[in-house]
Each structure stands twice: as structure tokens, then as C-alpha cells.
A protein has these predicted regions:
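Acidic/histidine-rich alpha-helical segments that form the ligand environment
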Residues: 79-115, 128-139
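Short, contiguous alpha-helical
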Residues: 8, 12-16, 20-26, 31-76, ...
Length: 157
């Protein structure tokens, strides 16, 4: 991250800190609840939320910003089941790759690949804008995960 400007370094740190919060939240959830969903349609398990964030991060940081395709099955992210050690290992690998992507990103340049249907998004004009979108998504999904954790881990009544 040495070639990044101070404000770009701040963005990189915010992104990694937010992902670390997701990681730690999943780590705190008891193993037996890690693949549980809330009793409502469209609910996702903690593992599904974490895996979705991993796929989302690399899609934008590598496939879009750098033009280096990272295979992703978005639908599978929302039906995934995995034990906690496996999910956290995958998340750790994703974090390392994501940080490497950021360090290679020329923040003020246009992304290498514009996803179909997203070309008109105002934040797609620079790689930094794309990473701000990733930050927005991580914040949203951290909130989703925290609500899921709070309901799954609440004391029985």
C-alpha cells in the first residue's frame, strides 16, 4: 500500500477493518449456529453472508478493477454450508488476496472491466469509486450479520 496516497491508504484500511469485523463476528458465533438462518424468507446464515462478502470483494477488486477474472458462483454463496474453520480459512485467504489487489490498484484510473448493466453507475468512473462501493457493501452486510447473530444467539424464552 506504499504507492497509495494518504486518502487511498485510509480507504484500504477501512475496507480491511470492516472485513475483519465480519470475520470476528462469524468467529464469535457458536459452531452449531454458523449455518443457521433466521425463520424468515430470504434469510442467510452467517457462513452465507461471509462467503458472499468474500466473493463480492474479489469480484470488484480483481475482476472489475484489475481485469483479472476470479471465478464466482454468486447463487452458491447464498446456499453454502461450511464449518467455521473452513469458512474462516477461506475468509483469511480472501483478505490476503484482496489486500494484494488493492496494493496493485491504480485508484484514479477507470476499472479494467465494466460489468454489463453497471456502466452508468457514478462510482464506476474510478477504481477508488469501485472500492468505495465495496466498503458500502461490507457495511451493509456487517449490519445484516450482526442482526442475524443477535437473533440466533439470543437466550431461549
Amino acid at each position: 500500500m506504499n504507492s497509495l496516497s494518504r486518502s487511498e491508504q485510509i480507504l484500504a484500511t477501512l475496507l480491511l477493518d470492516k472485513f475483519d469485523q465480519l470475520f470476528e463476528t462469524v468467529n464469535e458465533i457458536p459452531d452449531e449456529l454458523i449455518n443457521c438462518c433466521l425463520q424468515m424468507e430470504g434469510s442467510n446464515s452467517p457462513v452465507q453472508i461471509l462467503l458472499h462478502c468474500c466473493g463480492m470483494m474479489r469480484r470488484w477488486s480483481s475482476t472489475v478493477n484489475l481485469g483479472i477474472a476470479v471465478p464466482r458462483d454468486r447463487d452458491a454463496e447464498f446456499s453454502a454450508k461450511m464449518d467455521k474453520p473452513g469458512a474462516l480459512a477461506l475468509a483469511s485467504e480472501t483478505r490476503t488476496a484482496f489486500a494484494a489487489d488493492i496494493s496493485r490498484t491504480k485508484m484514479q484510473q477507470a476499472p479494467a472491466v465494466l460489468p454489463p448493466g453497471r456502466e452508468a453507475e457514478y462510482w464506476m468512473s474510478t477504481c477508488e469509486g469501485v472500492l468505495l462501493h465495496v466498503y458500502e457493501e461490507l457495511c451493509q452486510h456487517l449490519g445484516h450479520l450482526e442482526i442475524t447473530r443477535d437473533f440466533l444467539c439470543r437466550p431461549a424464552q
